Each structure stands twice: as C-alpha cells, then as structure tokens.
Amino acid sequence: MADFDMVLKCWGPVEADHATHGSLVLTRLFTEHPETLKLFPKFAGIAHGDLAGDAGVSAHGATVLKKLGDLLKARGGHAALLKPLSSSHATKHKIPIINFTLIAEVIGKVMEEKAGLDAAGQTALRNVMAIIITDMEADYKELGFTE
C-alpha cells in the first residue's frame, strides 16, 4: 500500500497530460527496445523520427497511462481491472510478459524526468509493477499464453 501511495504522489503531472507523457513513454520504449515496435503493427509504417509527433502513438500512450493510473489507484485490489487487460494482451495482441517489465522501466524514467519520481519512488514503482506483472502473468497462464 505504501508503494502505491508513493507512486501516486508523483502521478499528478502524468494524469494532467496523459497524451504527452504517453507519447514520451512509447517513443522511448521504441527507441530503447526497437524490437517492441513489432508488437504494434498499427505503428509499422511510421518513420522512427516521426513517432514522437504521431497522434496514434500519443493516443495509445495515453490509454496505457490511464489504465496504469486506474491500477495504481486500486492500491493492489486490481484483479477486476487487470483481468480484461491480461486477456486482451494475451489472446488478441499476443504481448509477451517481459514487455511489461520493459515499459515499466521506461515509465519510471519518464516519471523521474517529468514528474519528480525520486529514487525511493523508482523503487516503489518497480515494486508496484512487479505485483501487477506477476498478477498478469498468472492471468496469462490461466489463459494458456506462456510466451
């Protein structure tokens, strides 16, 4: 619970502008981990240099951060919120679980730079994301997706 609260203390700037922060997160994810771009077929034709200014990238990044905000605000009681996300990411999008660890690290970096998430907050975010990702992984296994 304390970890969730620590992350939420710095969530305000992210929540105030999901689109900008979401664009930063996805653009950095695609830059630091280029292989992840293949998981987003709708962005395939976008030149790398154009990703940051693309409305679709920004909109998807906003969706990611809004969902994460909902999960954070649930403070661990996120099973009902997480199940449909796990299901769509396992069965429809086929996203390997490791990618959630990659994006979590990128979110931490963006929050450090743009929302003042300090070292303790970074640790709290890693702890929170470990809980969420472990729960997603259990959902994935239940669905038979073990990639």
UniProtKB/Swiss-Prot annotation:
InterPro entries: Globin, Globin-like_sf, Myoglobin. SUPFAM superfamilies: Globin-like. GO terms for cellular component: extracellular exosome; sarcoplasm. Monomeric. Belongs to the globin family. O2 binds at residue 60. The lineage of its organism: Eukaryota, Metazoa, Chordata, Craniata, Vertebrata. One of its GO terms (molecular function) is heme binding. Residues 2-141 form the Globin domain. It catalyses: Fe(III)-heme b-[protein] + nitric oxide + H2O = Fe(II)-heme b-[protein] + nitrite + 2 H(+); H2O2 + AH2 = A + 2 H2O. This is Myoglobin. Keywords: Cytoplasm, Heme, Iron, Metal-binding, Muscle protein, Oxidoreductase, Oxygen transport, Transport. Heme b binds at residue 89. The keyword Endoplasmic reticulum does not apply. Monomeric heme protein which primary function is to store oxygen and facilitate its diffusion within muscle tissues. Reversibly binds oxygen through a pentacoordinated heme iron and enables its timely and efficient release as needed during periods of heightened demand. Depending on the oxidative conditions of tissues and cells, and in addition to its ability to bind oxygen, it also has a nitrite reductase activity whereby it regulates the production of bioactive nitric oxide. Its EC number is 1.7.-.-, 1.11.1.-.
